[in-house]
Design a protein with these regions (language model features):
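Auxiliary Fe-S-binding modules of radical SAM enzymes
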Residues: 1-53, 250-376
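Conserved, mostly hydrophobic/aromatic
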Residues: 64, 92, 130, 183, ...
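Generic structural signal for well-ordered alpha-helices
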Residues: 80, 117, 144-148, 170, ...
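Core AdoMet radical
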Residues: 99-114, 120-215, 221-225, 231, ...
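Alpha-helix N-cap and loop-to-helix initiation/capping positions
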Residues: 108, 139, 143, 199-207, ...
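Catalytic cores of alpha/beta
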Residues: 166-175, 232-246, 306-316
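Glycine-enriched alpha-helix->loop->beta-strand junction motifs that scaffold or abut catalytic
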Residues: 174-180, 219-220, 295, 315-321
Length: 376
């Protein structure tokens, strides 16, 4: 596949702001000023991500909760991922699917995919995220497209988290029923990125960076962003993720924007990398800052986090939660019978019904679907 270039200045703007971001320069006055505003500037967002803002977590949480209730009410959206292949052509040193890792590989055929979809649909879920390893050879666009057509038979909302593709490919996938695209930049530090991604198309930083914009050019309704917090300086990566989403929202105001906040987790046969530890308090700070800077964006909290943390954060800032998650291949139905190994370890293994009931006990409203398709 020839990697498409698009005419966009967003990457240069994000990298420039990230390089100039000195999070140790902010004062108590900067934090208080940001918290007194209804709408944050970029500098306000930077202030709330600073170490100094850790002293204001209670105030940030209160403000974030007010913002969440203003724009989302008490709704919490529920979805689940479905991994259909774990073959990968990339060598990302931190990932369980990387091409050098000796794991059990598998790719579901269409009969197995449909069996998985049927089983998941019995839970009442109406949104699903289709995931593959990043291998065009084993997971072609046509294969993914057919899988998404099957998914639309059972689910109202279908998202994908696959390798980045060109605009025409996104248009094709949209015609197969795909609504939104999730791409994690992993880290926005290009030099660190080179050290972590050693083989495959993922080595090309700029192509991955522009994926969300190509997806919107390819008629997708929404896009999701995320850095894998802990790979590098997490404050700069958190800022860059939010600023990237902010600039794309300004350029494409019709787009639905989502932010994910994953932290680095153990994987099978993982080699030692220079991990930047991110505490739960620091992750909570980041999520609150995202909510205040991007009030209309969905914020997804991953099963990489434990159940107690997830339950707390959906009451304050996050709006979307995964349930019934297994990152292995063929993990949901007896027909598929767990054919391939997991991408990473998860911390919250609750079922859909368990999370559904927990949300209700917190006086929140679990939502399976909020989008209606109108046929011509």
């Amino acid at each position: 596949m020839e990697l498409e270039n698009i005419n966009s200045d967003i990457m240069d703007r994000v990298i420039s702001e990230m390089n100039n971001y000195d999070y140790n320069s902010f004062t108590d006055e900067d934090i208080r000023e940001a918290l007194n505003k209804d709408y944050l500037s970029v500098r306000d967002f930077q202030a709330l991500l600073s170490p100094k803002a850790m002293n204001y977590l209670e105030e940030m949480a209160k403000k974030a909760k007010e913002c969440r209730e203003r724009y989302f009410g008490n709704s919490v959206y529920i979805f689940t991922p479905l991994y259909i292949s774990n073959y990968c052509d990339n060598y990302c040193v931190y990932c369980g699917f990387n091409s050098h890792n000796k794991i059990k590989r598998a790719r579901l055929d269409f009969e197995q995919i449909e069996a998985e979809l049927k089983e998941i649909s019995k839970t009442g879920l109406e949104e699903i995220l289709i995931l593959t390893g990043e291998s065009e050879r084993y997971s072609s666009i046509e294969y993914i497209g057919e899988a998404c057509k099957l998914a639309r038979k059972y689910f109202n909302n279908v998202g994908i988290e696959i390798y980045p593709v060109n605009v025409e490919d996104y248009k094709y996938l949209n015609s197969c029923g795909v609504d939104y695209v999730t791409i994690f930049q992993e880290t926005y530090n290009n030099e660190k990125y080179k050290k972590l991604h050693l083989e495959g198309h993922k080595k090309v930083f700029s192509y991955r960076f522009n994926s969300q914009e190509r997806a919107l050019m390819g008629n997708m309704r929404g896009v999701a962003f995320g850095a894998l917090l802990g790979l590098d300086d997490f404050r700069k990566d958190a800022f860059s993720t939010g600023y990237h989403a902010y600039l794309l929202q300004k350029k494409y105001p019709h787009a639905e924007i989502s932010i994910s906040c994953p932290r680095l987790r153990p994987v099978i046969n993982n080699i030692k990398i220079e991990e930047e530890f991110v505490s739960e308090k620091e992750l909570f700070q980041i999520i609150c800052a995202y909510r205040l800077f991007l009030p209309f964006a969905n914020i997804t909290i991953s099963t990489r986090e434990n159940s107690k943390f997830r339950d707390n954060v959906i009451k304050i800032a996050a709006t979307k939660i995964s349930a019934g998650v297994d990152t292995g291949i063929g993990a949901h139905s007896e027909h598929s019978n767990k054919k391939g190994d997991e991408q990473f370890e998860i911390a919250d293994r609750r079922t859909v019904s368990e999370i559904f009931e927990k949300i209700k006990t917190e006086d929140l409203q679990p939502v399976m679907n909020d989008y209606i398709y109108l046929k011509d």
